[in-house]
């Protein structure tokens, strides 16, 4: 498992934008590599939408985005199409299909206590290929994208001026807003049986919950 300050491991990966070699593909740029537990899951979908809607802000800081899960590339492509169809949001960044989990294990993205899916990890890598920040979130908690933007800016500022940034530095500069697709609703875990799927669909018809699909339902807290 890698540690903070270490060089990002050299690896060739299959992505939705074709094969690429990391970290060389992004040499001269910063990049944010983030893993998600699985395609066609609700929390991950909200994250991808928010990463996409903030993509230009990352680009303005000479920073690229790249996603990862242990799904196959065909699943990634279909999920990206679903997101475009449902929310009219293009996913402009590549997504790694680490279907054997090799890179995920190198980066400590798979917890032996949390199943075989990747956790919600974030790695910020500088233009020389060094890992500058590592964040891990549990599967049930979505990430705050403005905080990741703030962290990138803080690291770049530290490098440029030889300074350090204090707690809550520039939180006022970034708009901490609810999810653009579910607001402050909470997400109901995806159905794990046909009976549960049918129940969700019935509850949605009654207006008890809202669903974009049978696996993506949300509601207000009572």
From Swiss-Prot:
Residues annotated to bind substrate: 120
Location of the Thioredoxin domain: 2-157
EC number(s) reported in the record: 1.11.1.24
Catalytic site positions: 44
Presence of the UniProt keyword Disulfide bond in the record: yes
Keywords (A to Z) from UniProt: Antioxidant, Cytoplasm, Disulfide bond, Oxidoreductase, Peroxidase, Redox-active center
Claim: Zinc-finger is one of the keywords in the record: no
Catalytic activity field: a hydroperoxide + [thioredoxin]-dithiol = an alcohol + [thioredoxin]-disulfide + H2O
Main location: cytoplasm
Protein localization: Cytoplasm
Cysteines joined through disulfide linkages: 211-217
CDD domains recorded: PRX_1cys
GO CC, one annotated term: cytosol
A Gene Ontology BP annotation from the UniProt entry: response to oxidative stress
Gene3D superfamilies membership: Antioxidant, Horf6, Chain A, domain2 (3.30.1020.10), Glutaredoxin (3.40.30.10)
Source domain of life: Archaea
Cross-referenced InterPro entries: AhpC/TSA, Peroxiredoxin, Peroxiredoxin_AhpC-typ, Peroxiredoxin_C, Peroxiredoxin_TDXH, PRX_1cys, Thioredoxin-like_sf, Thioredoxin_domain
Top EC class for this record: oxidoreductase
GO MF entries: thioredoxin peroxidase activity
Note: The active site is a conserved redox-active cysteine residue, the peroxidatic cysteine (C(P)), which makes the nucleophilic attack on the peroxide substrate. The peroxide oxidizes the C(P)-SH to cysteine sulfenic acid (C(P)-SOH), which then reacts with another cysteine residue, the resolving cysteine (C(R)), to form a disulfide bridge. The disulfide is subsequently reduced by an appropriate electron donor to complete the catalytic cycle.
SUBUNIT field: Homodecamer. Pentamer of dimers that assemble into a ring structure.
Function comment: Thiol-specific peroxidase that catalyzes the reduction of hydrogen peroxide and organic hydroperoxides to water and alcohols, respectively. Plays a role in cell protection against oxidative stress by detoxifying peroxides.
Family in the record: Belongs to the peroxiredoxin family. Prx6 subfamily.
Protein name per Swiss-Prot or TrEMBL: Peroxiredoxin
Source organism of this protein record: Nanoarchaeum equitans (strain Kin4-M)
């Amino acid at each position: 498992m890698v540690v903070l300050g270490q060089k990002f491991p050299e690896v060739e990966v299959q992505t939705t934008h074709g094969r690429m070699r990391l970290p060389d593909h992004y040499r001269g740029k910063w990049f944010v590599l983030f893993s998600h537990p699985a395609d066609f899951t609700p929390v991950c979908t909200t994250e991808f939408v928010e990463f996409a809607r903030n993509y230009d802000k990352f680009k303005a800081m000479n920073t690229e985005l790249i996603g990862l899960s242990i799904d196959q590339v065909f699943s990634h492509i279909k999920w990206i199409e679903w997101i475009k169809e449902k929310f009219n949001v293009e996913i402009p960044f590549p997504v790694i299909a680490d279907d054997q989990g090799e890179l995920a294990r190198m980066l400590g993205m798979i917890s032996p206590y949390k199943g075989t899916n990747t956790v919600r990890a974030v790695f910020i890598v500088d233009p020389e290929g060094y890992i500058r920040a590592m964040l891990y979130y549990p599967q049930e908690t979505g990430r705050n994208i403005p905080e990741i933007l703030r962290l990138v800016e803080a690291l770049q500022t530290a490098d440029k001026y030889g300074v350090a940034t204090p707690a809550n530095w520039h939180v006022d500069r970034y708009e901490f807003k609810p999810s653009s697709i579910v607001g402050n609703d909470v997400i109901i875990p995806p159905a794990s049986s046909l009976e549960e799927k049918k129940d969700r669909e019935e509850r949605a018809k009654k207006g008890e919950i809202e669903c974009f699909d049978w696996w993506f339902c949300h509601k207000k807290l009572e």
